[in-house]
Amino acid sequence: MELHNIRDEYTKRVLSQHDCHKNPISQFEQWQKEAIHAQVNEPTAMNIATVDEQGRPNSRMVLLKEVNEQGFVFFTNYLSRKGGCIERNPYVALTFFWPELERQVRIEGKAVKIPAEQSDKYFATRPYTSRIGAWASEQSAVISNYKSLLAKAALVAAKHPLNVPRPDYWGGYLVVPETVEFWQGRPSRLHDRIRYRKESDNWIRERLSP
């Protein structure tokens, strides 16, 4: 299947280094708000790439649940494949892609577990069925069929008809950024790329060649 002729010309916006915030978190928050306002499909969806013990990368989509001055928070099963990779090598890469705005954000940094109390607080806000699912799913494990998963979920629901506690193996990670790159599509593939990199306690802001 040849895909050579599928291409778009990017013309919607410009990213000026002069107009960027001094802090990448503030710049990200601005872009995140604009993505939500533009009704981008799944504006909080991000790809997270990890590396296993053999140095092989793997990636998957997760949802960003919080941005704060420390970094980017997502939640998952700590016993999943991604959790195992992070346990052995905490350095990860995140990518957001908002095609409606012709924008991409790339983040590299270290993932650390957030305090259990914070995971408890978020878990309590999840829909009941999602909390049941956290107990029923042995994430990344091979299962015989879908019916067995539903049966396990039913057993969990019978045990916890009202309040569902958070499993110890489920919680949040904070990705503490070391580099953050903002990409804005431009005509003729001469895209805008502004990178922030951490040096000591300061952020260095620089333009990259496309």
From Swiss-Prot:
The cofactor(s) it depends on are: FMN
Matching Gene3D superfamilies: Electron Transport, Fmn-binding Protein, Chain A
Protein's GO biological process: pyridoxine biosynthetic process
From the UniProt record, list the reaction(s) this protein catalyses: pyridoxamine 5'-phosphate + O2 + H2O = pyridoxal 5'-phosphate + H2O2 + NH4(+); pyridoxine 5'-phosphate + O2 = pyridoxal 5'-phosphate + H2O2
Q: Which residues bind FMN?
A: 60-65, 75-76, 81-82, 104, 139-140, 183, 193
Q: Which UniProt keywords apply?
A: Flavoprotein, FMN, Oxidoreductase, Pyridoxine biosynthesis
Q: What is its EC number?
A: 1.4.3.5
Q: What residues does substrate bind to?
A: 7-10, 65, 122, 126, 130, 189-191
**UniProt pathway annotation:** Cofactor metabolism; pyridoxal 5'-phosphate salvage; pyridoxal 5'-phosphate from pyridoxamine 5'-phosphate: step 1/1; Cofactor metabolism; pyridoxal 5'-phosphate salvage; pyridoxal 5'-phosphate from pyridoxine 5'-phosphate: step 1/1
Q: Any binding details for the cofactor?
A: Binds 1 FMN per subunit.
* Source domain of life: Bacteria
Under the GO molecular function aspect, what terms does this record hold?
FMN binding; pyridoxamine phosphate oxidase activity
The free-text function statement in the UniProt record for this protein reads: Catalyzes the oxidation of either pyridoxine 5'-phosphate (PNP) or pyridoxamine 5'-phosphate (PMP) into pyridoxal 5'-phosphate (PLP).
Q: How does it assemble?
A: Homodimer.
* Family as reported in the entry's similarity comment: Belongs to the pyridoxamine 5'-phosphate oxidase family.
Record-given protein name: Pyridoxine/pyridoxamine 5'-phosphate oxidase
Designated gene of the protein: pdxH
